[in-house]
């Protein structure tokens, strides 16, 4: 299976998952608006998402894949999988226990500036979402097993179950049901990936030396990067009520193309580069082009249509016109750094694939230092949009750092991708005033896609040709 076919399989699964996530956010915004109630919900899922990112999309998958793919037979793979489940499973169970016993303390860590009402509600919700921590860890292990066997579609699809759980919970009109649905949906996602009848769990701690060496290096990198998320949440908790909700809703939109395209390319790159020998740098150059081909036009499109897109998706029910304007400003700032986040993640995965974890760790330290500093400066001067801008600037700095260290070769086709994206953005801006309302927004998006595909075809950008060729098979 070629890298573009793997990327498309992962992207398709992720697309369905992210679309259900978008529906989830629309329903959350419509039901609760940018309110203290929704703020409390987001506080309750901060830590489970932190662990999902470090395990499923970071330390666990990187360390697990690097070793699992080198093992020769099923017995070795089964023993290694059991050892990881045993050792880290006990750690997650302890975390769940502490979260259930001290939920108010957890809420206070993640939302220092929130009022007592928000913290108390968040504490109640944490008791419902905490079990997700162990669930998502076990899910992440089997997610990695599937990816190691080049099965990308189903694992990428499974996060949709948690989204569906939240959607169903919202139908009851109580945020507690939404939190419960979050955890129940996560359990459903795990059950789908479990290899019933093909894997027998045997408690063991054997053979984890190299895994932990890779895991802790990568985990520290990911943990440092996620500290910025906690700082984002804390700074937002000192701002106007609903600011955290606006940031979360806007960031989910910016993460939509990042998740469908950026994470897809990075995930496939980790698997491919882990097996690379002399063609490592050539493969990396190819993945850089693929990443930019998909994320650069997404970035420009989100900036050009930020308010129109927010209004189309969230401008209903309890979500006010003022909420729309504030969210659009936040989305614009996030979109500035979208392609740089994708490239930073890709270059970090390239280091992990070669079992070198120090450089991405220092790069993440830089990103975190810049982000935290700018969070405080811009967050308290610009408001919620300043927090988003801080994220973009910090990842630009991290990308520059990794580029200077790794010195990857960039394909000349990047100029063509930039030109096609610029033409697309210009056309959207010129036509924006001629297409009114939500239907007009949909037409503008379709026109943008058409223009980008057309100019990619005229400029003979290979990524488009490969996608069209694979899509026809």
From Swiss-Prot:
It holds the Pfam family MurJ. GO terms for molecular function: lipid-linked peptidoglycan transporter activity. GO terms for biological process: cell wall organization; lipid translocation; lipid-linked peptidoglycan transport; peptidoglycan biosynthetic process; regulation of cell shape. This is Probable lipid II flippase MurJ. HAMAP family: MurJ_MviN. It is a multi-pass membrane protein. Involved in peptidoglycan biosynthesis. Transports lipid-linked peptidoglycan precursors from the inner to the outer leaflet of the cytoplasmic membrane. Disulfide bonds: none annotated. The lineage of its organism: Bacteria, Thermotogati, Thermotogota, Thermotogae, Thermotogales. GO terms for cellular component: plasma membrane. InterPro entries: Lipid_II_flippase_MurJ/MviN, MurJ. It is found in: Cell inner membrane. It comes from the Bacteria.
């Amino acid at each position: 299976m070629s890298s573009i076919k793997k990327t498309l399989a992962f992207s398709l699964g992720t697309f369905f998952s992210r679309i259900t996530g978008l529906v989830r956010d629309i329903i959350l915004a419509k039901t609760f608006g940018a309110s203290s109630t929704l703020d409390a919900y987001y506080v309750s899922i901060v830590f489970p998402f932190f662990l999902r990112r470090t395990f499923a999309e970071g330390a666990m998958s990187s360390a697990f894949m690097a070793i699992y793919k080198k093992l020769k037979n099923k017995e070795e793979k089964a023993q290694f999988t059991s050892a990881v489940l045993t050792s880290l499973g006990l750690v997650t169970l302890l975390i769940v226990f502490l979260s259930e016993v001290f939920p108010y303390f957890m809420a206070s860590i993640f939302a220092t500036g929130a009022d007592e009402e928000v913290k108390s509600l968040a504490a109640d919700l944490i008791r419902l979402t905490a079990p997700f921590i162990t669930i998502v860890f076990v899910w992440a292990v089997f997610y990695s097993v599937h990816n190691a066997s080049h099965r990308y579609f189903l694992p990428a699809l499974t996060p949709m179950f948690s989204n569906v759980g939240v959607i169903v919970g919202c139908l009851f009109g109580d945020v507690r049901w939404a939190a419960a649905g979050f955890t129940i949906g996560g359990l459903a996602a795990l059950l789908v990936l479990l290899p019933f009848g093909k894997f027998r769990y045997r408690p063991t701690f054997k053979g984890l030396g190299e895994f932990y060496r890779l895991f802790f290096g990568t985990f520290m990198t990911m943990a440092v990067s996620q500290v910025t998320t906690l700082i984002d949440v804390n700074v937002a908790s000192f701002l106007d009520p609903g600011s955290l909700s606006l940031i979360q809703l806007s960031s989910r939109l910016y993460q939509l193309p990042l998740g469908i395209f950026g994470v897809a390319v990075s995930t496939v790159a980790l698997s491919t580069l882990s097996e690379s020998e002399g063609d490592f740098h050539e493969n990396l150059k190819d993945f850089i082009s693929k990443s930019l081909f998909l994320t650069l036009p997404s970035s420009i499109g989100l900036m050009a249509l930020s308010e129109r897109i927010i209004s189309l998706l969230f401008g209903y029910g309890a979500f006010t016109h003022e909420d729309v304007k504030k969210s659009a400003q936040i989305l614009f700032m996030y979109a500035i750094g979208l392609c740089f986040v994708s490239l930073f993640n890709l270059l970090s995965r390239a280091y992990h694939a070669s079992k070198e974890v120090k450089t991405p760790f220092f790069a993440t330290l830089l990103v975190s230092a810049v982000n935290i500093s700018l969070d405080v400066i811009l967050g308290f001067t610009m408001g919620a949009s300043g927090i988003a801008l801080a994220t973009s600037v910090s990842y630009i700095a991290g990308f520059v750092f990794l580029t200077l260290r790794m010195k990857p070769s960039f394909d000349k086709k990047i100029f063509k991708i930039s030109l096609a994206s610029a033409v697309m953005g210009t056309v959207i801006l010129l036509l924006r005033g001629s297409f009114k309302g939500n239907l007009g927004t949909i037409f503008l998006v379709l026109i943008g896609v058409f223009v980008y595909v057309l100019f990619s075809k005229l400029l003979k950008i290979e990524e488009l040709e490969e996608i069209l060729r694979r899509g026809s098979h």
